[in-house]
Amino acid sequence: MDKTFAIYNFGCKVNQEEGGALAALFSSLGWRQEPEQPQLIIINTCTVTAVADKKARNLIRRLRREHPQAVLAVCGCYAQRDAAEIAAIGGVDIIAGVDERRQLPRLVEAYCRQRHHHDAGNNDPLVEVSPIATLRHFHRIAADNIQPRARAYLKIEDGCDQFCKYCIIPHVRGPVRSLPLQQAIEQTRLLLAAGHQEIVLSGIHIGAYGRDLPQGEDLPTLIKSLLTLPGLVRLRLGSIEPQQFSEQLISLFAEQERICPHLHIPLQAGCDRTLEAMGRHYTTEQYAQLIERLRALRPQTAFTTDIIVGFPGESEEDFAASLAFVASLELADSHIFPYSRRSGTPAATMPQQLSNSIKSERAARLNQVAENNAQRYRQQFVGKTLDLLGEEIVEISGNSYLRGHSANYLSLLLPLTERSPHLQGQLLPVRGVELYDEGLIVERC
């Protein structure tokens, strides 16, 4: 078997990062990425919505048709939630749960031995999916080769204990499990030594970091430890729930400029009645007060969020309240999701389930408000100085640009010429010139 592989990732940034770690793991073992003619195909799935499940099923069928001889492995959250449904599709060789992804090289080897020595007509997949609720220790996908990028993701936590009434994630990710503090520090040292200037702390519920650790560590403790490391230019925080902003965390954000002025704080609904029905345990007033306080401490902070529309029982009056509340927050970006009914969650059996047409119509209306807010936020940086961390060279309409992000996570494009020096991985002072679809076109200061 030629050691060529392709990997397809669905879902959140954590899942994307885990997919990157999987690719690095296989590369470190002598495998080569070859998307055109792979002998191994890995599909790293998401199951947060029914649409995500459907996309994964469609991709499985298409890739099996296109690559009938390849070993096809399906892993991740959908595999964890319903391995039997995936097996029923046909053509899947390996199914691995969330925790078993790190064992994929072993599973591929075992499957190939099994196929060689036993009945070639046996179409049953090799399945390894452990009960996620029993997991008590953080496991990361260990990869020896660290990719040379300007930004690196450090997964510090997995799992969630919130059990919001609409959410399947605690059922497929399990309880909160934290990367031990010293391991987080050592992994960050390796990333900085490899040239990464920005570290992004990621996880499913990073505000709960340390809850399971024996020494009482928490997210502020970890942040303070990482900020002592030489070479760390930016520290970006992943998604943090509103209730997880302790006084210590707020003080750190105010005092430490290397913590990026970019906070993703899930809202989920802008109506108190809906928030209560979701089991979110805060009010719109508390959320607004948090944003107001953080914005006063660092005025140019980009606040981003997630919002669900069409939750069971959401009336037009509830939605109108949510629409007005989101408009008032003036957030830098909002990810809008129509509610997706997930079997096994309390919301799936709630009365007053809304039609897809109502959910789609409300999502479109809220998206327009969110885009207006985002454009106003970006506009204020035209003519202002920003720091661009160069990430990659891109071609757009025949022109070359250095693409990267500012500390407040604006997507920036710097036009390049043939004489432009090598700028990837460098931190550059730039000035905003004009808006483009996703961010700002900039020039060197």
Label every model-predicted segment.
Residues 91, 254-261, 329-332:
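Glycine-enriched alpha-helix->loop->beta-strand junction motifs that scaffold or abut catalytic
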Residues 42, 77, 104, 201, ...:
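Residue-level signal for inorganic ion chemistry
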Residues 52-54, 175-180, 210-216, 277-280, ...:
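Short, solvent-exposed loop/turn segments at secondary-structure boundaries
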Residues 349-445:
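Terminal RNA-binding accessory module
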Residues 314, 326-331:
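Contiguous mid-protein beta-loop-alpha structural module that forms a pocket-lining wall or clamp
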Residues 72-73, 81-82, 193-316:
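Conserved SAM/AdoMet-binding glycine-rich loop
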Residues 1-209, 224, 248, 263, ...:
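Proteins enriched for Cys/Gly/acidic motifs involved in redox and nucleic-acid/cofactor modification
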Residues 147-150, 160-161, 259, 269, ...:
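Short flexible coil/turn linkers enriched for glycine and charged/polar residues
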